[in-house]
Amino acid sequence: MQELHLLWWALLLGLAQACPEPCDCGEKYGFQIADCAYRDLESVPPGFPANVTTLSLSANRLPGLPEGAFREVPLLQSLWLAHNEIRTVAAGALASLSHLKSLDLSHNLISDFAWSDLHNLSALQLLKMDSNELTFIPRDAFRSLRALRSLQLNHNRLHTLAEGTFTPLTALSHLQINENPFDCTCGIVWLKTWALTTAVSIPEQDNIACTSPHVLKGTPLSRLPPLPCSAPSVQLSYQPSQDGAELRPGFVLALHCDVDGQPAPQLHWHIQIPSGIVEITSPNVGTDGRALPGTPVASSQPRFQAFANGSLLIPDFGKLEEGTYSCLATNELGSAESSVDVALATPGEGGEDTLGRRFHGKAVEGKGCYTVDNEVQPSGPEDNVVIIYLSRAGNPEAAVAEGVPGQLPPGLLLLGQSLLLFFFLTSF
């Protein structure tokens, strides 16, 4: 039994002293160090002692870091990988290093980085990613790095940074973002304001400069002139017809999304109907209502016709098209959305009572009812439903109906005499 214990301890001692052949392992200043720098390595060698806290793989020829590359060294506190040929850091390559405090990936060729791995590195204090090929950093990349003190992103290919990127870094004291080809458009204005007001040390600010547009090339971000910028706004309204459109006979639902903002926002329709969700990210028809070249539709006339001016037409509107129609606008400064619920009810079959029960008490403060002439009629907080009767020709006649408690809500707009459409207007 005693011999068995001796063999067991000998095995443990051997494992503790194991070290990959190209590397030097030992203790220094109370840290377990594995030095594999300048070894002409093309991959991370296996066989490290599990108690290693500092690992240097600098100045090798590593082309990438695969998933689980450092699974053998879970207690690692410092990892040095500078001056390699790393292009890709795969998801899971760094995620297991929850004790890591210093990470140096500088002077590589990294363009593909698993930013989600950083979410597990909450102890990180130093992150060096300068002199790489990074073009994009997600807004939430640093969300867990509340202990980070120094961040180096200089000498990359970053064109912009999302507002709020550095907000989670409450301990940050040093930031380098110079020598990046920034696009000085509305999306970068926040960075100028933040850099001028933050207590974080940001050296070489004259080298944080614009690459585009051409008129601003070379201008330091700190001296960027005021730009005409505004976040998107949207107003979703009903229109009885679409000028110049060739519509098929029958009922027509026409919506118009009025979008404002600088730079000009991108318009996107999100339609939720019984059969699923329809996304329309660009116009799919011309003014004649026929599909534009390249539009993926089965016929020459799409079911949901999105025009370049912000209008959306649904000819022959029926039960299959009931649902929620949302207009979304997005630019560099943010997004805005407005929605309308659309359903059919047959007059004389309890449709009005159904609508009254469904929407009773759901007041939308500050909304307005749109007439056939697309003029907004002021409505009080109790005006929350617009009832629309469309004629077969698609040319409704307007009349306003007053409601009382227990019946249809007030502020209803009645159009025509055949098919009932109701809209519950909401804005986000």
Swiss-Prot record:
It is found in: Secreted. Its main location: secreted. Residues 1-18 form the signal peptide. Disulfide bonds join C257-C327. PROSITE patterns: IG_LIKE, LRR. Residues 180-231 form the LRRCT domain. Keywords: Disulfide bond, Glycoprotein, Immunoglobulin domain, Leucine-rich repeat, Repeat, Secreted, Signal. GO terms for biological process: cell adhesion. SUPFAM superfamilies: Immunoglobulin (SSF48726), L domain-like (SSF52058). Glycans are attached at N51, N309. The keyword Glycoprotein applies. Residues 19-50 form the LRRNT domain. GO terms for cellular component: extracellular exosome; extracellular region; platelet alpha granule lumen. It comes from the Eukaryota. Expressed in various tissues including retina, heart, skeletal muscle, prostate, ovary, small intestine, thyroid, adrenal cortex, testis, stomach and spinal cord. LRR repeats lie at residues 51-72, 75-96, 99-122, 123-144, 147-168. InterPro entries: Cys-rich_flank_reg_C, Ig-like_dom, Ig-like_dom_sf, Ig-like_fold, Ig_sub2, Leu-rich_rpt, Leu-rich_rpt_typical-subtyp, LRR_dom_sf. Residues 232-343 form the Ig-like domain. PANTHER family: IG(IMMUNOGLOBULIN) AND LRR(LEUCINE RICH REPEAT) DOMAINS, IMMUNOGLOBULIN SUPERFAMILY CONTAINING LEUCINE-RICH REPEAT PROTEIN. This is Immunoglobulin superfamily containing leucine-rich repeat protein. It comes from Homo sapiens (Human).
